[in-house]
């Protein structure tokens, strides 16, 4: 009895919230019911609002009458409200009008309960509950203005039906807790017909979802514990290494200068550091240096996996520099310094050679004019032009080689490990872009200097031709008086 009272209270509250006077639904509350009865009896006052309501009452076909049980008894009882409803028989398509009793919202529980629970011959209730289709069919044959949603809600709140629908693989009885479940009702669509198979399916789905939630919560707790311990160990190892790696692009960026030789030296030093670090990481055993070099090349050829986080052992082994690595770094740095000196000497010779050629060209021109030797001036002019062209070609080749070498050194001297953060990658990219812009500016300056030198050469050639022509005419004029 307590479960029935709780069910009545919950269902009644839901009905009043859903189908009350405030909600615009196709239902009839007690207040609206009394107003319709007054309008049909002629006691309702006329107004604009009543005119609309009166039109609605006439369009629906409400009328007063006596219930069937009162008609059989023949006694004069209170009249009830009926409405005309179009019905069809099961065989034909012909429609006919029949009267249905108007169901009041406040009486929904009693109406559905009387149709849902079967009664015995003596009026006693049998513990047999009908399904949704059966209950709604019995209600629709006698009542109107009672939606299917209310029937579905009632069946979902019925504790007896819930016990019957509850799955029991062991065959044991279940205890009635007196409270209908609320989780299932939120998952059900009340506007669709619900069968026993559908209810069992929804029940199984609910049980499976609860089991999945429990398992996922346990697994997530275990994963959080293991992940937190693992990440704390990795972060402690990564902190020092990341700081060193973040400082390296800044130092390289600060040491760059407008001079190409300074940039090449910085690129060589960074390349030496990276090669020494890789050699120190992969060459742990000092006994076999050739095998260490092979393994280093094989590991450099392997692609970097950016998704996997490196372990602490790998990070410490990659960034450990031992004595052998420092010796190799010093040797390699000495070789780079010697190469750098050779490049500087070549560039100094190349830069001095054009000035020397110009001075020799001027001196040759003056000597040819003074002496009047046509062959010597022509030969010297040709030789100076050839030397000047050769110096320009060699200078261009050296410059292009130096630019390509600087690009390769700048590219190879900045290896990007998989664990670098976005800030470090951005700083490396910014330094590379700045060095590239400087190289482009230098190339533009060199091209401009070459373009300015080309017209000067063209001007020198006509002057040489005029000088030779003048020297050729002078001996001719001197020979004429002798002839």
Curated annotation (Swiss-Prot):
UniProtKB keywords: Nucleus
GO cellular component, one term: nucleolus
InterPro entries to which the protein is assigned, alphabetical: HTH_NOL4 (IPR056549), NOL4/NOL4L (IPR039788)
Domain of life: Eukaryota
Any Pfam family matching the protein: HTH_NOL4_2nd
Polar residues bias (residue ranges): 229-254, 262-271, 302-317, 351-363, 467-483
Designated name of the protein: Nucleolar protein 4
Species in which this protein is naturally found: Mus musculus
């Amino acid at each position: 009895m307590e479960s029935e009272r709780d069910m009545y209270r919950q269902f009644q509250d839901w009905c009043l919230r859903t189908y009350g006077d405030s909600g615009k639904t196709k239902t009839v509350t007690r207040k609206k019911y009394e107003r319709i009865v007054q309008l049909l009896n002629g006691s309702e006052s006329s107004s604009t609002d009543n005119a609309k309501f009166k039109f609605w009452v006439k369009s629906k076909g409400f009328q007063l009458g006596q219930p069937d049980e009162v008609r059989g008894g023949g006694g004069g009882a209170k009249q009830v409200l009926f409405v005309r409803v179009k019905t069809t028989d099961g065989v034909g398509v012909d429609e006919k009008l029949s009267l249905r009793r108007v169901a009041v919202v406040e009486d929904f529980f009693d109406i559905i309960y009387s149709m849902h629970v079967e009664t015995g011959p003596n009026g006693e209730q049998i513990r047999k509950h009908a399904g949704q289709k059966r209950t709604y069919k019995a209600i629709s044959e006698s009542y109107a203005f009672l939606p299917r949603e209310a029937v579905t809600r009632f069946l979902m709140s019925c504790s007896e039906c819930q016990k019957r629908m509850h799955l029991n693989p062991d065959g044991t009885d279940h205890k009635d807790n007196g409270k209908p479940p609320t989780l299932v009702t939120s998952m059900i669509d009340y506007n669709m017909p619900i069968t026993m198979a559908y209810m069992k399916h929804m029940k199984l789905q609910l049980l499976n979802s609860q089991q999945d939630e429990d398992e996922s919560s346990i697994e997530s707790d275990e994963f959080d514990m293991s992940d937190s311990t693992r990440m704390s160990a990795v972060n402690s190892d990564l902190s020092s290494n990341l700081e060193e790696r973040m400082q390296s692009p800044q130092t390289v960026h600060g040491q760059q200068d407008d001079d190409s030789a300074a940039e090449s030296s910085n690129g060589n030093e960074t390349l030496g550091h990276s090669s020494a670090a890789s050699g120190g990481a992969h060459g742990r055993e000092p006994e076999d240096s050739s095998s260490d070099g092979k393994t280093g090349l094989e590991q450099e050829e392997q692609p970097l996996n950016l998704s996997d986080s490196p372990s602490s052992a790998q990070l410490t082994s990659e960034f450990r520099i031992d004595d052998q690595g420092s010796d190799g770094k010093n040797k390699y740095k000495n070789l780079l310094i010697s190469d750098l000196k050779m490049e500087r000497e070549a560039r100094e010779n190349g830069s001095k050679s054009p000035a020397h050629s110009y001075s020799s060209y001027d001196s040759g021109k003056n000597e040819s004019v003074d002496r009047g030797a046509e062959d010597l001036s022509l030969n010297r002019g040709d030789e100076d032009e050839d030397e000047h062209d050769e110096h320009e070609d060699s200078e261009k080749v050296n410059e292009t080689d130096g630019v390509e070498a600087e690009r390769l050194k700048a590219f190879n001297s900045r290896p990007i490990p998989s664990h670098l953060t976005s800030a470090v990658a951005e700083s490396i990219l910014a330094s590379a872009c700045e060095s590239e812009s400087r190289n482009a500016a230098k190339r533009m300056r060199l091209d401009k200097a070459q373009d300015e030198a080309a017209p000067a050469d063209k001007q020198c050639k006509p002057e040489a031709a005029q000088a030779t022509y003048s020297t050729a005419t002078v001996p001719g004029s001197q020979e004429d008086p002798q002839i």
